[in-house]
Structures are given as C-alpha cells and as structure tokens.
Amino acid sequence: MQEIYRVKTSPVALSDNMIIGEKYRITLLTEALVRLEYSEDGVFEDRATQTVLFRDFPKTDYHVVRNADGIEVHTSMLHLIYNEKEFSSHGLSIQIKGNLSAYHSIWHYGEKVHDLQGTARTLDDVNGEVELGHGVVSRFGYSILDDSKSQILLDDGWIEPRKKGVSDLYFFGYGHDYKQALNDFYRLCGKTPMLPRYALGNWWSRYYKYSEESYMELMDKFDEKNIPFTVAVIDMDWHQVDVDPKYGSGWTGYTWNKKLFPDPKRFLGKLHDRGMHTTLNVHPADGVQGCEEMYVDMAKEMGVDYENEDPVVCDPASPKFMEAYFKYLHHPREAEGVDFWWIDWQQGSNCKVEGLDPLWIFNHFHYLDNKRDGRRPMTFSRYAGPGSHRYPIGFSGDTHITWESLDFQPYFTTTATNIGYGWWSHDIGGHMLGYKDDELTARWTQYGIFSPIMRLHSSCSEFNGKEPWRFKKETEEAMEAALRQRHCMIPYLYTMNYRSYAENMPLIEPMYYEYPENAEAYEVKNQYFFGSQLMAAPVTTPRIKGLNVAKTKVWFPEGIWYDIYTGMRYDGGRMLEVYRDLSSIPVFAKAGGILVCADADELDARSVIKNPDVLCVRVFPEADGEFELYEDDNESCGYVDGRCVTTAMKYSADKDMFVISPADGDTSLIPDNRTYKLVFERRTEAAADKVKVSVDGKEVLAKNKYDKENRKLIVTVNASTASKISVAISKDTVALDNQIEKRCFDFLNQAEIGFVLKDEIYGLITSGKKTIVILSELKAKELDTELYGVLTEILTA
C-alpha cells in the first residue's frame, strides 16, 4: 500500500526482558506490565498488531526462581507463579504486591477480571445503560488486555490474521497507580494524537434533508443570535438517496444530490468562509452502485463489469478496494472542500477475513488517509476496540432522548479513560425516540460543555430539532449560554488537547485517578476532573417540583473549592448534596485554579479557530496555582516536532500576586501583543484600590473594574506577549463569606412554597444564631427533605 498507510511501530521487545520456554514466552515490559504468550509450536509474534505497536520498553528489573514445579518471577510490583505448561487457572497466577486487598489481588489465568471498566462500541438504540468492556485499571490492582485475536500489521501497511490457538495477554498490575497504568498503555499501544482546534468548538448535526439555501439560512440565524459553531455535520441527504430500487436502498451514496446542493464546492466554500469545517456522513456497506458518478472508474479499477452495472462490493478486507475507495470516492469530495468523514458503519464486526472488524479497517485507514496532505487528521466513527484512541473522534451512536440516557453518559465517558479513549462525541440532546423535555435538553447541552466534544444532534422528525429557539425561554437561554461558553473555553480545551497527547491524560479524568485510596472517589459515578483545573458533576435528573432546583451528589476532596457559576465557596473533605437551578450545573475550580478562556466578544468560528488576541483569565484565591497555556498552528502535525509556544501563569496566595511569564517557543504562532482580562474571583470592593500592575518590572496603569454583584475584580492589561506581567493585590481583599442570607433569600423568593414557611425559615437564618443551631431548629420543623437539603448546602458550604 501507499506510504501514507504505513504506521510507525517498534514492536520487538528487549531480549533481556524475556523469559522463554519451549512453548511460552513471558516478557517483563515493566515491573507491572507483563506479556504472556503461549504457542504449541513455540513460535511467538514480534510484529505489531492492530492494538499493540510498541514493545521496545527499557530493561526491567526482575529475578527468576526455578524449582521442580516451574518458575517464579519477582518484580517490585508482582509475583508470578507458572508451571511452564499450557496456560491454566491452576498453573499460572500473578499476585499484586502491596496488600491491596485480603484475597482479591491475585489473578489466576482464565478468571473473570473485575476492573473499573472501559467503554463500548456504541450507544445505538440505547435507553440508559449498556454493558461496558474492560479497562486497564482496577481497585483489585490488575486487569488484562487480551491481544490473542487482533490482526497483524504488516510492513507494507496492510494486515493479516493471527495464527489461531495462541494466547497473547498483557497483564497490567499497577495496583492503584492508575495514571502509570494508563501511561504505559499508551506507551504500548500508541499515543492519542491532537485534534485540530476547530474540533473543540460546537458542532451542528442533524439527520435532516437540508439544501444549500436552507442550511445557510440556518447558519445566518445562528449568527444573528450569536450562537457559534465550528463544525457542520451533513448527514446522509448530501448524497442521492431516492435511487432506482435496482441500485439498492440509497443508504450508501457518494454522488451529491444536486437538487439540494447544486454547487457543492460553493456550499463548502461558504462554510469555510465562516471559519467552519465540514464532515459528510457515509455508510460504506452497500458498496458502489451503477448510479454513482464515479462508478465506472471504480468498477474498472476493481475489474467489475461496468457495462452490466454490476455493483462494486464493499470489501474492506481487500487492500485494492480500500485504495480505490479513497481514490475515487473520497479524494474528489475532499478536493471540493470536505474536511473529514463521518464513517457510519452499522453492519457488525464480520467480513471476509475471520476476526477482522470492518469498523477498525475503516477507522484506521480513514485516519491515515486524512493526513496525506500534511494536515492534522481526524475521523469520526464508532469505537472498534482497544487502540481506537489513535483514531479520534468517537461517535457514540443514536441514543434515545431520555433522562436515563443522559444520566449514563457522564459515567460512560469517564470509564472510557480507563482504556485510553478520551474523545467521545455524543449526540448532545439525544438522537431519537424518547420525548420532548425542555429541561432535559438544557441539562444535556450544559453537560456538552464539559464533555469531550459538543455536538448537537437529532433525528429527521420535524419536531426534533435542537435549535435553541424551539424551546421555552429559560431553556433557550440556558442552551445559548452553554454554546457560547464552550467556545469561550477553547484556549483551555486546546491546552488539555495537548496534555492528552504529551502527558497521556485524557480531558476526562475519573476522580479515583487523583484519589485512589478514597472510597468516595468511586461512589460519584458522574463526577470527574475536566482537565487540570476543573471538577464537574453534571445535572442528570429533573428539578424538584416547587423548589425549581435539581439535586446532585458531589464529593469535595480536601481543600477549598469554588463553583465557577455561582461563586459559592466549599470546604472539602466531604460528600454533599448540591442544588442548582436551570442556569448552571455544579462545576468547581480548586483554590489556586487558573482558567484561561477566550473573550466573550470573540466567539465566532473565525475567531476561535486561531490563537486569540484577547484572553480572559480567571484566578481563584486562597492557594498557590499554576497553568501553562499551550498554542501551536492549530492544524498541522508540527506539534509532534515541538513547534509550539507556551505561556506560563502562576498565582501566589501568600503574596496575592499573579504572574504571566513571557511566551516561550515559536512566538510567530501567536499575536505580538495581547489584551489580558484578568478576573480575580471572590474579592471585596477594596481590591480595586489595592491592585498594582507591572509590565517587565515597570508599574503601569491598568483598567480596573469591580463587579459588585459577582464580587470579581477585573484588571485589563495590554502588553507584548514577550513581556512579563505581574498583578499584586492584597490577600485581605479575598471575600471568604458565602453571603448566606442573600443566597437563602434568593432561593426562598423563587421557591413555590408557603409564605408563612418562607418567613419562618428566613427569620431563623437571619437570627444571628450559630449555624449548628439554625440547622437543628430547621430540622425540628420537619421540613421537606429536599428543602432542608438546599438550606443545608448554603449554610454549611
């Protein structure tokens, strides 16, 4: 195959790390990662597979003890016992050292593994939960990656089936060091590549028969309402679907529907002019029929009788078909302006070659083909098993529009990190069936801000669009705010995009990665870290009738936490039920957090796909913090060679000083000068008089503004990106109180409960009594449980 389809690999392990017997080979890749092979003919596999690319780990420290019963292998992490016979539950075991559990931390070959789960192929037609596959981390300290049946990657870029009857397992025995387990999984299977910047913005997607005219009218309306999008997803009606039955169903197609899109190049050009990128849906399964405009060329290439219009069968097991598939079906469309492809493969995991999953073939080659002109590649398709993280982005499928589906998605996305799959794209708002529920749509869109990809989607039902103006005013406002905020967060998201590649940590990080020994970290299934600076717990249940707030259980680790929406300050080290109205969901920055965003006035696609002239930086007090903003050209693979620029930011709580260091690296990639809007959270009004700003050591006048309602000090500085900026305030201007009386009044004022009860509650809250006394007296009133819960949150935060 062509050079572009050949993958860089280094599959041969160091011989010093191998223990080889007549029919087995044990390879100690690390002191916690063991490859276990058994083959009756004593021939073992040293080539790369579709899952595993790199076995060239450094030399491992281990020792072997041989006795009459077989061998024992010791590392600092593991104790392996093997009788040197065919793998069996009584003959092969590995124990995790470190006293993780009384009896659960020993694995016997063939036993079912109980890990923290991974992900699934799809959520198609799912209402609620779905069974998940395995990950590489477990509370018991170990998990298994079975590579026995994956295809072999050949040097020429193609694949071949593995020899049957072999065992090829990777034992991950990292105890509770989940980060290291994941890091070595990426070391073994390849890194997650960076996404182009535009992918982190909002995607508009709908299964609907748009035309060029109607689509551009819709985009104009979004612009009028300041609702930004960076990606246009054109579902299957871009191509001919109403074909002569002799050509099949029209489900598969590659020829533009000229009635809807008379000039495709013009249409795609208009989207590009807006700063948008485009993906087209393709269902490859039915091959190429005689009605397609490229049929004759494709048929000739494949040796098909084109005069008789015999169909070109979709054969992903054929390298000849795959090369022609791209040459004739996709490259011409890309020349017209298509940026990447939505591979909508729904026909299962079988093809002509036993064990070869067509979905994997399409994902693998589409991704590689997409980078042939030097751009940063991307594809959009379902998950095809371990190793699929190398082909972002994942399409999770056609979910039902229900609260049950929303409630499962944060957990589903979080556990995917356990198998390294960090870029799921869900149908935000759900796809089909279910019911219309304005509140559900608002909450789903809010979750979309804090999911890997924000892609609104819906079915072709005339009643099932996700345009915000289709919903009640409060939902419309919540959706619009969410879509704008997603674009605001692109500088932060792009830095996390790089972190995912460089540091092997996906955007969505389970709580137990940071706190593996805290039982609470495993209990909050829908709570996670969203990058390095935020902790999210999306709302996935309806509001409580009468109180008009929804309840979410949140675990606050030790420290001080700030809700980025409400400004509430929380003491950590506890579990707490928190309540939110429709305007926000629980998202927290830890004390010392630094959140770098785009300016609210520069959210259109043309602005957010480039490195910004204006940055908004939110700084949260009471602890030291640091953040390094990452930037590059946003679209090439230059990041692999280190072509980038970073800007370090640091906050010192003791000095109450925030410092932006000069940009470091290839500064031609960013503006020469920038405007920084520095937002110091939770400040008293006195802060405005105490702020001092210096640029390169020289004190300068800066524009200061105090937001009294939200208790923020906003300092605006214009400076060269090559300069050092320092802002000093005074830590005695940090507003520590939560304005309890005001918050309780605002809640009670909107609550649909009795006036007498409101007066009694508010009178008690403003009585000046100690919090513990107020709580006990409220309890004695036998209030509704949820009403008491709301008041408890405000009083005890």
Per-region residue spans from a language model:
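Aromatic-lined carbohydrate-binding/catalytic grooves of carbohydrate-active enzymes
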Residues: 193-350, 389
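Solvent-exposed beta-strand/loop surfaces of large extracellular or lumenal domains
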Residues: 47-61, 304, 562-582, 688-716
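Short, well-ordered beta-strand segments enriched in hydrophobic/aromatic residues
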Residues: 26, 34-36, 73-80, 535-538, ...
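A low-complexity, Ser/Thr/Gly/Pro-enriched, surface-exposed linker/loop concept
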Residues: 4-5, 29-68
